[in-house]
Amino acid sequence: KIFVVDYKSNSLPDYGPAALLQSIQDQEYDLQYLLYTVAVHRWLVLRMTDYCYDRHFGGIRYLYARGITPSLPGSGLFTDLPPERLILSLDRCFSRKEQDRG
């Protein structure tokens, strides 16, 4: 599977799931990863004749480097898998904008 992986160096008081979600929302990384996902989706459509979002795209992995602790599995790791429907809708929306400009 293909994943979007991004490293973050944010200094947070806590690197548990709730703190990471708050950081994702505060910094608008959720918007960032949706844009990344649309870009990867478009690339895969062009490169793979049998591309299927559910089968080939594994999701988002944001690694908060300061929070990764081997003794605390999952600490410093944010994961998400945006729904295919959302990615297809965004892709169509961006395509319309490109056509409107042309």
Task: Outline where the language-model segments fall.
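Structural signature of nuclease core domains in nucleic-acid processing machines
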Residues: 1-102
